[in-house]
Swiss-Prot record:
Residues with glycosylation annotation: 44, 72, 99, 124, 135
Bilayer topology term: Lipid-anchor; GPI-anchor
Name of the protein: Uncharacterized GPI-anchored protein At3g06035
Principal subcellular localization: membrane
Intracellular or extracellular location(s): Cell membrane
Keywords: Cell membrane, Glycoprotein, GPI-anchor, Lipoprotein, Membrane, Signal
InterPro entries from the UniProt entry: At5g19230-like
């Protein structure tokens, strides 16, 4: 009797191990990307595609603003030419495997919005000095990072000076990690099914 249930048990075990839950996490970054691309569509511009290296830089820049309060002279309200300068900018670029020549034509736009309320976040980019960059057709890619009340948008171009393209793609690294987990799962399933086979 138990041997009759073995194929069903094996099938269910394999099915459970292969079934990887997909987490649907709609966050401020995704909402902002959708809003910016909708805005660009209404301006008859192409949508911006995600750029992982720009996203890395946006995350690192947002981290620099950690615990910095929102004021009338921070973020999108900053007077041009008075933007914060980071002494460790070369190290920030290095963390993302970038250098100054790969980012020269790009644009870094920080905004501070209490609790990152989505409508206000989008307005901080579309109804401020940042709208000039969003309306510029030279930009083709985007990276978004956030920390506390800060959200940073990095725009990229398709030129060598603004492509943010020198980093090793993180997808390759993560695919290797996924493959490693998948291989372990298959080995565990194989060992489990072999054990069950010899047990009965």
């Amino acid at each position: 009797m138990a041997i009759d249930k073995l194929p069903l048990l094996l099938f269910l075990s394999i099915l459970l191990c292969l079934n990887r839950p997909v987490l649907s996490d709609t966050d401020e970054e995704d909402i902002l990307l959708t809003g910016i691309n909708s805005y660009r569509t209404t301006q008859n511009l192409t949508i911006l595609s995600k750029n992982e290296n720009a996203e890395c830089l946006a995350d690192e820049i947002a981290d620099q603003f950690k615990n910095k309060p929102c004021t009338n002279d921070t973020g999108s309200a900053t007077v041009p030419g008075t933007e914060p300068q980071f002494a460790n900018y070369p190290q920030i670029l290095a963390k993302c495997h970038l250098n100054v020549s790969d980012t020269r034509d790009g644009s870094i736009m920080p905004a501070c919005v209490p609790r990152l309320e989505s409508n206000l976040v989008l307005t901080n980019f579309t109804k401020s000095q940042y709208s000039m960059s969003l309306n510029d057709s030279k930009f083709t890619g985007i990276g978004i990072g956030k920390e506390d009340d800060w959200i940073v948008v990095v725009l990229t171009t398709n030129t060598p000076e603004g492509s943010y393209s020198t980093a090793t793609p993180t997808k390759q690294e993560s695919n290797g990690f996924t493959f490693g987990i998948g291989l372990v799962s298959y080995l565990v399933i194989f060992m489990y099914s072999s054990f069950c086979f010899f047990l009965f």
